């Protein structure tokens, strides 16, 4: 049984973007798209999936065989008792689970207790000044380091700014 991969970090730091990049990496390496289940709980399409039971039903309806599945759950904190269904998926399905969500809810008391030893946390941080400058230069935003420092002080290292 694989550990649940938990991406945490402040709002807008790039967790959802990173989750999508991880999924794309699997696809580029030949993982079957039909065996990837992706749910963004901030998408109205999934508005009715707000309980562990409904999430369990939805995911199990998507599974068609015993091959390995990848399950990507973005903003999982919108699902009540999500920690129970994650533990169930991990115990009963041939899958690898990746989740994102609010720092304050993902690894708080109840989830931490139910999933202790079953998950690994990856703390996602906004870009540092050096990372922001390197990326800005790579995409053609030519500024001197001093000019960019003013920009960085105003906007920070959040990926959306690019």
Residue ranges and their predicted role:
Residues 1-162:
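Phosphate-binding site recognition
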